[in-house]
């Protein structure tokens, strides 16, 4: 069995997605996601110029060997562009292997560890009252876990506050938009949101919050401490993870569970945080961390230290990544939760899939492979559109972490 083609497909049914389709001499094909939000064409170039030509003639069943080839063979390893290209190849190969075996991907990974996948949705509003109402909307839809983000008085375009009730897409056309940030204002306001949420809905639902790398270690510890009475499922990305020792300070001052890792690319990014038990959830993704082959290694390491998975699942990941993540979630023993932001109807049409939502959980189907395909004819009707993620500045104009 040989790979005969590896084609890159770019489409924008509401936002940009990069898809790799690997074809074989036996007529079986697989698809993988290579989307890097706001930097999509960098991965396209890497795939087309440096990866796809090398795959022709290889045996697609040799998943591990091909993973090592595209990782070690490049010499310039790691990084978001390289690892997303590797992830796309890896997803497509697992898709092919599961199709050849005639079984859904989770069976090939080791079978079910659970029936349904608990997911969390994104509720947001321009102020506390609007966010409380939005959380109620998600509860009415059956969600058991909801991330809550609110606009903060005096902060321009606070993170996580979208233009609609169900869809949040921060990437803008043209050049990056400028948002604001003021830690003092956020620390004074965010705890009030969760106080009101618990007062309104009680403690029967899981609540989550994303700091999005905005806080210093001391500020993050302060926020975690203030949120303790409201029993959050987790506080995500409370401080930039490049400074991993910072999580030791946060850990020493709060028992609010900590989650990090959506921007991690390899096990080396997560190793110290996991082994030192400085986090509770690892949020590395199938597309960001080099595919299922490498994400399994991260999860296996995490399981030794009682760290659970909580894969990133925003709309910057295509349904291909979501499908792979759900098969991974169905298998992985140390599963925690799965982020789930609904895609647009146009995106769902371009990427037909067999997973579905019911009563706060996602379920995978029994289709051989990862259960997600791409309608190339429809995809061609949505050409690429340049879009950048925003940037953030403090009130005095200083650049900050978006």
From Swiss-Prot:
The record marks 314 as: Important for activity and substrate specificity. Pathway: Carbohydrate metabolism; pentose and glucuronate interconversion. Mg(2+) binds at residues 210, 236, 262. Its EC number is 4.2.1.8. Gene3D superfamilies: Enolase-like C-terminal domain (3.20.20.120), Enolase-like, N-terminal domain (3.30.390.10). GO terms for molecular function: magnesium ion binding; mannonate dehydratase activity. It comes from the Bacteria. It holds the Pfam family MR_MLE_N. Changing residue 147 to A: Abolishes catalytic activity. The active site is at residues 159, 212. Binds 1 Mg(2+) ion per subunit. Substrate binds at residues 37, 122, 262, 283, 312, 316, 339. It catalyses: D-mannonate = 2-dehydro-3-deoxy-D-gluconate + H2O. NCBIfam families: ManoateDhtManD, PRK15072.1. This is D-mannonate dehydratase. It comes from Novosphingobium aromaticivorans (strain ATCC 700278 / DSM 12444 / CCUG 56034 / CIP 105152 / NBRC 16084 / F199).
């Amino acid at each position: 069995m040989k790979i005969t083609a590896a084609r890159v497909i770019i489409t924008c049914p509401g936002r940009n997605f990069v898809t790799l389709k690997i074809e074989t001499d036996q007529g079986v094909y697989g698809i993988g996601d290579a989307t890097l939000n706001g930097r999509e064409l960098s991965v396209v170039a890497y795939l087309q110029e440096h990866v796809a030509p090398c795959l022709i003639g290889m045996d697609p069943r040799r998943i591990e060997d091909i993973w090592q080839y595209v990782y070690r063979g490049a010499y310039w390893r790691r990084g978001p562009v390289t690892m997303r290209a590797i992830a796309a190849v890896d997803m497509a190969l697992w898709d092919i292997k599961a199709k050849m075996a005639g079984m859904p991907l989770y069976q090939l990974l080791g079978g079910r560890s659970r029936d349904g996948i608990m997911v969390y949705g994104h509720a947001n509003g321009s102020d506390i009252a609007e966010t409380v109402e939005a959380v109620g909307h998600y509860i009415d839809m059956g969600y058991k876990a909801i991330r809550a983000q609110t606009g903060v008085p005096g902060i321009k375009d606070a993170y996580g506050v979208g233009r609609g009730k169900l869809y949040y897409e921060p990437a803008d056309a043209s050049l990056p938009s400028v948002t604001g940030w003021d830690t003092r204002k956020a620390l004074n306001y965010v705890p009030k949101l969760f106080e009101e949420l618990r007062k309104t809905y009680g403690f029967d639902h899981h609540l989550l919050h994303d700091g999005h790398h905005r806080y210093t270690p001391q500020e993050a510890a302060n926020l975690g401490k203030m949120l303790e009475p409201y029993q959050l499922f987790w506080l995500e990305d409370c401080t930039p993870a490049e400074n991993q020792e910072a999580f030791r300070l946060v850990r020493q001052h709060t028992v609010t569970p900590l989650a990090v890792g959506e921007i991690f690319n390899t096990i080396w990014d997560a190793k110290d945080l996991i082994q030192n038990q400085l986090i509770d959830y690892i949020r590395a993704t199938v597309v960001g961390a080099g595919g299922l082959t490498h994400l399994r290694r991260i999860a296996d390491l995490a399981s030794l230290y009682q760290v659970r998975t909580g894969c990133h699942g925003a709309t910057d990941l295509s349904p291909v990544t979501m499908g792979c993540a759900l098969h991974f979630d169905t298998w992985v023993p140390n599963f925690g939760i799965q982020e789930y932001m609904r895609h647009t109807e146009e995106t769902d049409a371009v990427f037909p899939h067999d997973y579905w939502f019911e009563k706060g959980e996602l379920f995978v189907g029994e289709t051989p492979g990862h259960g997600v395909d791409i309608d190339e004819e429809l995809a061609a009707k949505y050409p690429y559109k340049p879009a950048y993620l925003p940037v953030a500045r403090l009130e005095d104009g200083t650049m900050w972490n978006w």
